[in-house]
Amino acid sequence: MVSLELLSSLDGLLWLQSGAKVGALFQQHQTTVSRNQKKCAQVFGISLFKHKKKWSTNGDETLLQLERRVHQAARLQGKSRLRIEINGWFDSPHFNPPPSGWIVGSANNHGDPHGIQCFRQHIIDVCLCPLTNLPTESQDLTIIPLNTTIEFGFVVLQQHANQERISELIYTLKQI
C-alpha cells in the first residue's frame, strides 16, 4: 500500500494532466507532486510518460488498480474527500465553492473520454457530463440527471449509485 499523498500525486497527474493543477488541488508543491508520482510509479513497477501533451502510464497496472479500489473505498467511507470531474464547469454555483467533502477538478482534456477513463480507473468518483454528451450506456454505469436549468448529470458506477456520500452530493446540488 502507498500513502494517500503518493497515490494522489500519480492519479492527480493522470486525471488533471497538469502538475500545477495537482499541486493546487492537493495542496502540494509542484516539485513534491513530481517526486511523489515517481515514487508511487516505482512502487507499482510502472512509468509515466507524456505523449502528444497527455500523461499516460506504461507497464502492468494490476496492483495499481487494486490500490485505487482500496483508496476509493476509503473515500466512500468518508476517510478522505471524494473526487469529482466537472469538465470545465468551475463557474457554476454548484461547484464554486466545492461541495463539502469533495475535491473538484477539471482536466485539460474536455473533448475526449478522459474523464470517463479516469472514472473507470477509480481515479475519480463521479464525472459530470452534459446530458447531450453522455457516454454510451453500459451495465456498470448509472447516469443521474440533476434536473437543473443547465442540463447536466453525473455518471457513477452502478454499484455506487446509492452510496450515501454520492446521494448527499446529488441532493445538495439539486437544492442550488
Residue ranges: model-predicted function:
Residues 1-110:
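N-terminal hydrophobic or amphipathic helices and topogenic motifs
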Residues 25, 110-127, 131-135:
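Short helices/loops that flank or line small-molecule/ion binding pockets
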Residues 33, 165-176:
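Bilobed periplasmic-binding protein/Venus flytrap-like ligand-binding cleft at the lobe interface
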Residues 46-47, 135-154:
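Ligand-binding "clamshell"
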Residues 80-84, 124-126, 154:
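Hydrophobic beta-strand segments of well-ordered beta-sheets in folded domains
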Residues 86, 129, 156-158:
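Short beta-strand/turn micro-motifs composed of small residues
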Residues 89-92, 111, 132-137, 160-162:
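Short acidic, S/G/P-rich loop/turn micro-motifs used as interaction or catalytic elements
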Residues 151-165:
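A bilobed periplasmic-binding-protein/Venus flytrap-type ligand-binding module shared by bacterial periplasmic
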